[in-house]
Amino acid sequence: MVQAAILFILAGLAEIGGGYLVWLWLREARPYWYGVIGAIILVFYGIIPTLQKFPSFGRVYAAYGGVFIILAVLWGWGVDKKMPDTYDWIGAAICLVGVTVMLWAPRQ
C-alpha cells in the first residue's frame, strides 16, 4: 500500500510538474527549454504507473486520477498561491475515498 501511494504521488508530481513547465513555456512565454524539460518529465509520468503491482491498466489509471486531483489542488495552493475553498477539499476527499474503494476493496 505504501509503495502504491508513493508511485501515485511520483506520477502525479511528474504529470503536474511536466505539464506546468509546458504551460509556462506556451502560455507565459518562458524559454523553449521549459517545454523540453516538461516533455521529458511527462515521459517519466507515462512510465511510472507501469511500476504499480495492480494488474489492470484501467483500475490503476482511474485510481491515479483521484490522486491527481488531490495533488493538483495542493499544487495550485502551493505553487500558484490559489487557496482551495471548502468545496475543493470536500471534492478531493471524495476522490480519495473512491481511490481507496477501487484499489483495496476485498475482491474474490
UniProtKB/Swiss-Prot annotation:
* Keywords attached to this entry: Cell membrane, Membrane, Transmembrane, Transmembrane helix
GO cellular component terms, A-Z: plasma membrane
Q: Where are the transmembrane segments?
A: 6-26, 31-51, 60-80, 86-106
UniProt key word DNA-binding? no
Q: Where in the cell is it found?
A: Cell membrane
Q: What topology does the record note for this protein and the membrane?
A: Multi-pass membrane protein
State the InterPro entries in the record: UPF0060 (IPR003844)
The record's family statement is: Belongs to the UPF0060 family.
Q: What is this protein called?
A: UPF0060 membrane protein DSY4157
Q: Which organism is it from?
A: Desulfitobacterium hafniense (strain Y51)
